[in-house]
Every structure is written in structure tokens, then in C-alpha cells.
Swiss-Prot record:
Belongs to the leguminous lectin family. Glycans are attached at N48, N57, N183, N255, N270. It comes from Bauhinia purpurea (Camel's foot tree). N-acetyl-D-galactosamine specific lectin. Displays antiviral activity and therefore may contribute to defense against infections. This is Lectin. Ca(2+) binds at D163, W165, N167, D172.
Amino acid sequence: MLLYNSKSYVLQLIFITLLLTQLNKVKSTSSTLTGFTFPNFWSNTQENGTEIIFLGNATYTPGALRLTRIGEDGIPLKSNAGQASYSRPVFLWDSTGHVASFYTSFSFIVRSIDVPHITADGFAFFLAPVDSSVKDYGGCLGLFRYKTATDPSKNQVVAVEFDTWPNTEWSDLRYPHIGINVNSTVSVATTRWDNDDAYVTKSTAHITYDATSKIITVLLTYDNGRHYQLSHVVDLPKILPERVRIGFSGGTGFNETQYILSWSFTSTLNSTKISALTQKLRSSASYSSM
């Protein structure tokens, strides 16, 4: 749901400070499995491709990861898809019963030549098998094939999508939305996304997975105080392999491209820390709507 209040900007600053403090505590524990922070994408590390892998039409551009193509004139192009992912496999679970919890945060902006009338299709943060590849463009967001997009038995991916175009042919929602997707383009949980802000200002997303409760929680925030939240139970070990690839996948049907401006990720076997982060996410959303 959309939550907005004139005082929420200050409250969100307080929340983010507390959240980062808690995140640093998670990173400092011996149970941390994977942890990285890209405060921006200006450095040579990202430019040389040592930390980020690009597939399809995704590429590095000074200051950002661009997921889909633009023309020589800088205008986003139709009908293409791309992925930018972390270069190392990420541990998710093992046969002894260990399951990782994780927290990720990233900022992004969407560009289009025809806002807000015709723009499509969006992008997603995803977890998939290490050997997965870029698939179809448009509403498939590079994660699915059109012929099997709604068949969970044919797919293996969990994603949080930022969908700028409602694909009604899949019985999808009839408005832009944020969704949690499990092996299908049809989301298992959604919230309406009044996404005009995404085209003119930076968006910041926070996503947690609590291995104990098996809940994925999503919070999207804007500097103007707007924010959106949703959550859903997803049993990741029943869906994904022990080690996965994580990253971003975007697709276009109309003229749009998506830029990832910053990205941090940490996973841990200490689900208590992630539970605390999740509670802060939910508390922030509830408090700033008062």
C-alpha cells in the first residue's frame, strides 16, 4: 500500500540510520556468509567487471548499472532485456538444515521518453540458479520465456519485481505494481505502485528474507516521504538450489531503461539479526503513516 505523510521524510532518515547501524552489526558477526556494498558504480572495480557480471543488453555506465539498451541518441530502446548480477555464487541452504537469511538494499531510477503514458516493462531483483541465463524481453523481464511464463513447473526463480506495465494477458494486475514472484510472471503478493516518482527521483528498496519465518519483506522509499511495503511467505529451499545467483534483470516492451545506482547485500545464518531488521522495516512503515 502507499503510505505518505509530511513528517515521514525525517522519520525515514532516522529509520535508515538505525537500519544501517543494525546492518553493520550483522556484517560484523562470524555467521555472515556473503556481504558487499557498492555505494555507487563509479569505481574501477565495477568498471573492470570483477564484481558484476552483465548478460544480454545490460552494461556498466558511469555511475550505474544499466539493465536495458539505449540508442546512440540516449533514448531507451524497445524490446530487449539484460541482467547485472553479483559475480560469486551465494549460499542459500544445505543438507544439514542451515538456511541463510539476507538483507539487500539498492537505489534505482527508471528512464523513459513517454512518461507517464506508455512505458514498459520494469525490472526485478532476483535469485536463480547459478547457470541461469537471460530470457525473453517485455513483461518476462529477462527472467521467463513467454511460452512458459505462468507455469511454475517450468521455471526456477524468486524475484521482487518493479512492474511498470500491467500484462493483462497473464491475468496480471491492471496497474503498475511491486510484486513477489515465485517461478511465474504472476505475482504471489502485490501492492499498487504509483510509479511516477520512479522516473524523476531516486527510489530506494529494502528487501529481507527471514529464514525462520520464511517471510520476504519489501519496503520501497522515496525522499518525498512516499513508501510502499509488502511481504509474503516463501520457502526458498523448496524452490531454489543450495547456491544461487543474485542480481537485477530488466526488460522493455516500450521505450524504457532502468539504472541501479547503488547496491548492498548481506546474508547470515543468524536469523535473529535479520528478524530485527525486518521489524524495523515494518515499524518504519507503520510509524510514518501515523
